[in-house]
Swiss-Prot record:
NCBIfam families: miaA
Catalytic activity: adenosine(37) in tRNA + dimethylallyl diphosphate = N(6)-dimethylallyladenosine(37) in tRNA + diphosphate
The organism of origin for this protein: Cereibacter sphaeroides (strain KD131 / KCTC 12085) (Rhodobacter sphaeroides)
UniProt subunit comment: Monomer.
Site (Interaction with substrate tRNA): 127, 149
Binding site for substrate: 42-47
SUPFAM superfamilies: P-loop containing nucleoside triphosphate hydrolases
Domain of life: Bacteria
Protein name per the record: tRNA dimethylallyltransferase
Record-stated family: Belongs to the IPP transferase family.
Gene that produces this protein: miaA
Cofactor(s) the protein needs: Mg(2+)
Amino acid sequence: MAEDAQGRPAPTSPFFVTIPSKLLPQLPDIPSDRPVLIAGPTASGKSALAVRLVEDGGGVVVNADALQVYDCWRILSARPSAAEEAALPHRLYGHVGARQTYSAGHWLKEVAAVLAEGLRPVIVGGTGLYFSALTEGLAEIPHTPPEVRAEADARLAEAGLARMVAELDAETAARIDLQNPARVQRAWEVLRATGRGLARWQAETAPPLLPLSDATALVIRPDPTWLAQRIDSRFNLMMADGALEEVRAALPGWDPTLPSARAIGAPELVAHLRGEIPLDEAVAAAKLASRQYAKRQRTWFRNRMRLWHEIRLP
């Protein structure tokens, strides 16, 4: 089995670089010097499209996926292979340690440094918050104290998501994804630490780093049934490429409260490796989690990216 630079299994399946056949004909005219943003749900072919655009027009592929930043996840996050990263300029992939915290603010500062390099950026990913921070601006919210983070972790574990949602201010609750535990906990922490709701802080947002009017913004809108089939097929290939071994390598010191532990499929495979569920159940649960994640992504894109150029698939 192939390995990456850190000795971990590296994805080899051609599925990871497949562009759906009906995608390219839907592209608008894209000047070679204009920044490109590509958003889409998991397994929709967006990363392969970014590579094609850089191959054809030059520039650098920039990651906008909150899990592809972590060095422990190449296969499970569908990060580009080591060979792909070497073939073209790539930025912000696999550069963060598994135990480090990494926020949209961290990402935005690093993107600013990439833009300063002067290469045309093709920014691609499925984390909607990164794109909104980039094109709409990001509020300067004070850092959450460790004791508040610990209190939030305990409260979510003991009282559950619904209770935490009920304790949010109404303005924030109306704006965030209430099905996303990470987003809800972050909003709860801000309110607890500062006495002001997240929505109030966001109202004091600085100007955007890259306004939408200065970029070609593409959002992939796949048919849910078609996408579900691709998700299931891709996870099968991930397993064949060594996803279980990748999770096994991350098992020592596993901490489910870390942001890196939110990799889709990781908790399910950890449960199997700990003897809690059989492998077939873990795989089925991981596929379900991936489909549910894709649904949340589609909802975000539909509600927040109405001015982006749509690409319908298949």
